[in-house]
Amino acid sequence: MALVGIVMGSDSDMPVMAKAADILEQLGISYEMTIISAHREPDVFFEYAKSAEEKGFKVIIAGAGMAAHLPGMCAAIFPMPVIGIPMHTTSLGGRDSLYSIVQMPTGIPVATVAINGGANAGILAAKILATSDAALLERLKDYTKNLKESVQKKDARLQAVSYTHLRAHETCADL
């Protein structure tokens, strides 16, 4: 049974939503991913949101661009946490999506990550689930420890080769 529902409004959102799925997989969290347009398929959307709780979802990660009603409507129907991912758009750089998701009325909150913030949405979903799963909490602590060690290794490399040498390369990994 999937613990997290990942829903997006368009297949063009897949690269961002895949980052959330990747994090969930790394942490051993089951999920179900689907594409539903809240505007073009309202009947399909309503059935998805209404049935999410009985499917066993504890969190929904919803990504959408432009008018971005998908996350807010999920939050209006699904009684548990919804994480919204505003998608970058060509017309307004994603600000339209961001404002649509964060400006929710009282009583219908959507936890919102950065524009195209798929990875952080996955991490936030994991943190929500970890409040009642000690083993997952330990995996999250390990994940955070690995992030810290990665930064420390990059700094050690920078100190070893100097900024002048590094400047000619894109990242420490390119050396």
Regions found by a protein language model. Give the residues of each.
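Active-site-proximal loop->helix
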Residues: A21, F46-E47, A76, G93-P105
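Short glycine/serine/threonine-rich phosphate/pyrophosphate-binding segments
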Residues: D13-M17, P42, A67-M73, L92-R95, ...
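Conserved small/polar residues in nucleotide/adenosyl-binding loops
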Residues: T164-T171
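Glycine-rich phosphate-binding loop
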Residues: Y48-P86
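N-terminal beta-loop-helix "entrance" segment that forms/cooperates
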Residues: I36-E53
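Glycine-rich phosphate/diphosphate-binding loop of Rossmann-like nucleotide-binding domains
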Residues: V4-E32, S37-A38
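C-terminal binding/interaction regions
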Residues: S12, S97-V161
